[in-house]
Amino acid sequence: MTGMATSGLLTDLRHLVEGEVTAAPEVLERYAQDFGRIIRKSPAVVVRPRDASDVVRVVRYAHSREVPVSSRGMGHSQRGQSLTDQGIVLDLRVLGGIDAIAPEAEAFVCQPGALWSEVVAASTAQGLAPPVLTGYPYASVGGTHAACGWGTASGRYGAQIDNCDALEVVTGTGDLVQCDRERSPDLFLHVLGGMGQFGIMTRIRHKLRRYLPQVRRYVLEYEDLGAFVADNRSLAEHHHADAIDSTLQQKPDGAAVRWGGTIQVCVETDDPGALDAARWLSGLHFDRLRETVDEPTSRFLAQAHIPEKSPLPGEFFPWMVTFLPWSRLQPFLEMCFSRVPPAALGGTQGLIHVYPARRSVTQMPMLQVPDEPMMALLSICPTAREPALPVVMALMSKLSDASLEVGGRRHLGTWVHFDQPRWRLQFGEDWPRINQVKRRFDPKGILNPGFIDFDA
């Protein structure tokens, strides 16, 4: 976009909206990258809307002139999903209000820029909590609803998007729509997990649940991968734990490197002293019970021990996160152990996360998962320095392709570098429907362009 065109865009938007409109170079620079730090796109203008009406005005203007618009919360995407090249960035973090905590309805209503840490603080004050929290409390509610929102409790409750009751959405034509599973269900079901491709959320209604006052965590250690995989399945399938947090980590072993596993089994209770560890852990094949930890559930949910992370200069994050059919989990992990060098994951500090779940816990068209009754979300999260970035990216792409080949499906909020054949494989028989919904609600393709390669 030329300087004259940018000036005209800036002038027009300042007349249209009541929020802030800026093209200050230092502001544009902050919005030119996301958390992944790999993709760079330079916006022409950043808009910080005052309310949903401002979002409507911006999108209607952009639709009439075919100007791209990207919606952005905390910018935690890794493939440029929240970036735009010479278009408009809508900074939704400024729409951060929590409108209501409704104990009787067991729900909360908020704007998209509210942080999950803020929601947890407000809801636990009334003895309620969201069913699922991701491992990072500083993500925005709108951001995880656009991506997926998977966490340690997903084996019981599904993704965060499975627990959304209703949305207010601005479509790609600038229409403000109230939607849920009964009203405009196509819009509702595709905006959730849709990475901003079908509409922009301006208000979210989400479930809450009541919780017991204490959490007990059993921390189990494993040396044998087969036992680690089998116990994850058993816990997700039969034990009904409130949360399962499983990790694999490289450990030095002389000149070699071996992998060890840890499973944290989290159980809510009225009285930790009344819990029978032998009953909860019977039939499992761990090598050691490393520790048993009791704490208030409100503190456990607050995740206050997790620091807020900003990328350091020269750091890049091409994370590969995929849902795998359970029958392929152990062979895939064994392949990762042989192909992923220790340095690619940050040495012994690097983790592979495994989240076991039944297939039935999620039923969302934009959250594609394998067909088997049991599955696992596998998260490989390297931190790469610039000299090693091309090698790490190539490795993550190979692992991504390997996961698709065995029936896996990718999490779209992370490093996803697909051509159209891969997009068709990702969505399978849902691909034609997804294209129809895109054409209906964003006919000019102005919303977050450049990520999903839709049919022409």
Task: Describe each PLM feature range.
Residues V47-R50, Q78-D99, A153-T173, I200-I204, ...:
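Structural signature of FAD isoalloxazine-binding scaffolds in flavoprotein oxidoreductases
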